[in-house]
Design a protein with these regions (language model features):
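Outer-membrane beta-barrel channel domains
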Residues: 1-230
């Protein structure tokens, strides 16, 4: 894809367009539920530690109640960020038990300072010499997996992954909005999630921790009292 103002077939934008998205996806082949090679997006659990599936905020949490919590989607969007690149697969081990594995390595745009990444850029814009100088200057690696068990109305799962950058993250924590931004080059996260779905009651949640050493949790509940009130 080409954004407005970006050079066409020149200044490092090429061979024709600035951004391409490619993938190969196989679904429903024996025990293999999903195999995606190339660029893809993931959503695990409630998305507390892993969600680049374009759903954020409180409303998305409520709208996702009762839905499949482990999703691999091919990245076919023109959006040149917020995706993984590599391979992801979900296999049914036995009835009700699925195992998902994923690995990703990709270049990222960033603002660098003193040998570190001060800001990760997600606009995907490469129009000027300044923006081109920030293109693909660092790389990100991610590998992990998910185990999910479903029986009747009950679902439980666990997710874990390791994430690293080629250069350390060095945000300016003096800025209020970056006060809690991560610092360093290697991180890990792990979580457990659950859901119970019945015709009237839906309960869903996820609790996580990581290399930051703190615990986070998100939980939601919906109850249908009548056709007009819930």
């Amino acid at each position: 894809s080409k954004d407005a103002g970006e050079p066409f077939m020149s200044q490092g934008n090429g061979p024709v367009y600035d951004f391409y998205s490619f993938y190969l996806q196989i679904r429903g082949w024996g025990r293999l539920k999903n195999l995606t090679l190339g660029r893809y997006r993931l959503h695990e659990g409630m998305g507390l530690i892993l969600n680049n599936d374009f759903s954020f905020g409180k409303l998305s949490t409520l709208s996702a109640l009762g839905r499949n919590s482990n999703v691999i989607r091919a990245h076919s969007s023109r959006y040149a960020a917020n995706y993984l690149q590599g391979a992801a697969a979900t296999v049914t081990v036995v009835r009700g038990l699925d195992v998902t594995g994923f690995v990703s390595y990709r270049k990222i745009d960033a603002t660098l300072k003193d040998g570190g990444i001060q800001t990760i850029l997600t606009s995907g814009l490469h129009r000027t010499a300044s923006e081109m100088a920030k293109k693909d200057v660092a790389s990100a690696f991610l590998a992990g997996g998910n185990v999910s068990y479903r029986r009747g109305a009950l679902h439980v799962g666990a997710t874990g992954f390791y994430n690293s950058f080629s250069l350390p993250l060095t945000p300016n924590r003096k800025l209020l909005y970056k006060r809690f931004a991560p610092v360093g080059s290697a991180f890990w996260n792990a979580s457990v999630d659950y859901s119970y779905v019945s015709p009237r009651l839906v309960v869903q949640g996820e609790t996580a921790t990581g290399s930051c050493g703190v615990v986070a949790t998100v939980n939601a509940m919906s109850y249908v009292f009548s056709n007009r009130f819930s």
